[in-house]
């Protein structure tokens, strides 16, 4: 129990500026949408979280997507276990930058680290007033998000809204699963090996017993 409880997972959010990364983190950690002041970068956060029976200590790191932070941002990538790569469902540019900017950056500074692809601001995609105020806007569809997920090799693609809290928890649950999945598989393999060894021992005893009986 102690080993699973002490497992630390460093989760880093990345993506263009103004896609809602900080709001998503605030919403996840406080269960409310920030209406007054939204900081540029969310303070690092750590808490014990239980996902599928496994307790982990989840550490959340926020990053600023603006170009001014291009040199500083990669310092947050060191030791990352998983990335939450975000784009806005109502920003075609942020969607395109996932493949053009963020994947090359992550592959350069943190190769091999798994990621969860997230489309934010889900509530605005169907908001008639918002769409009317932004003529010519072409929201990203679920199918296009899935297509991008396959292209970048992400296991999960989740659409969420910090304002309504829809799927926000699912984002970070998926990030945790992405890290603990190999650990669970390894535990299962170890259990299987122990069981096979135990069964082999029992079989040997039975055979030995038979030999003794024949004598």
From Swiss-Prot:
Domain of life according to the entry: Eukaryota
Covalent lipid sites (S-palmitoyl cysteine): 202, 208
Record-listed GTP binding positions: 15-22, 62-66, 120-123
Gene3D superfamilies: P-loop containing nucleotide triphosphate hydrolases
Topology of this chain in the membrane: Lipid-anchor
InterPro entries from the UniProt entry: P-loop_NTPase, Small_GTP-bd, Small_GTPase, Small_GTPase_Rho
Keyword Endoplasmic reticulum tagged: no
Keyword vocabulary terms for this entry: Cytoplasm, Cytoskeleton, GTP-binding, Lipoprotein, Membrane, Nucleotide-binding, Palmitate
Short motif (Effector region): ranges: 37-45
GO BP: negative regulation of abscisic acid-activated signaling pathway; plant-type cell wall organization; regulation of plant-type cell wall cellulose biosynthetic process; small GTPase-mediated signal transduction
Compartment list: Membrane; Cytoplasm; Cytoplasm, Cytoskeleton
GO CC entries: cytoplasm; cytoskeleton; nucleus; plasma membrane; secondary cell wall
Effect on the protein of changing residue 208 to S: Affects the membrane location
One Pfam family this sequence matches: Ras
Entry GO MF terms: GTP binding; GTPase activity; protein kinase binding; protein phosphatase binding
Disulphide connectivity of cysteines: none
Family: Belongs to the small GTPase superfamily. Rho family.
Quaternary data: Component of the active ARAC10-IRC5-KIN13A complex. Interacts with ICR5.
Function: Involved in local disassembly of cortical microtubules when associated with ICR5 and KIN13A.
Protein name: Rac-like GTP-binding protein ARAC10
Native source species: Arabidopsis thaliana
Gene this chain is encoded by: ARAC10
């Amino acid at each position: 129990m102690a080993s699973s409880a002490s497992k630390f997972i460093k989760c880093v959010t990345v993506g263009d500026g103004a896609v809602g990364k900080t709001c998503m983190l605030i919403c996840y950690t406080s269960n409310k949408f920030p209406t007054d002041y939204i900081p540029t970068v969310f303070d690092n956060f750590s808490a014990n979280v239980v996902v599928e029976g496994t307790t982990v200590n989840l550490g959340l790191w926020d990053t600023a997507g603006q170009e001014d932070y291009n040199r500083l941002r990669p310092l947050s990538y060191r030791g990352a276990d998983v990335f939450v790569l975000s784009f806005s469902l109502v920003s075609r540019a942020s969607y395109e930058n996932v493949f053009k900017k963020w994947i090359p950056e992550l592959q350069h500074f943190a190769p091999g680290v798994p990621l969860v692809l997230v489309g934010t601001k889900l509530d605005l995609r169907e908001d008639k007033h918002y769409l009317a105020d932004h003529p010519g806007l072409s929201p990203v569809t679920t199918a296009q998000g899935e297509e991008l997920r396959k292209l970048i090799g992400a296991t999960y693609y989740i659409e969420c809204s910090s304002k309504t809290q829809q799927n926000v928890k699912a984002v970070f649950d998926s990030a945790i699963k992405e890290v603990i999945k190999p650990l669970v598989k390894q535990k299962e393999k170890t259990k299987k090996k122990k069981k096979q060894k135990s069964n082999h021992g029992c079989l040997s005893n039975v055979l030995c017993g038979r030999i003794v009986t024949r004598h």
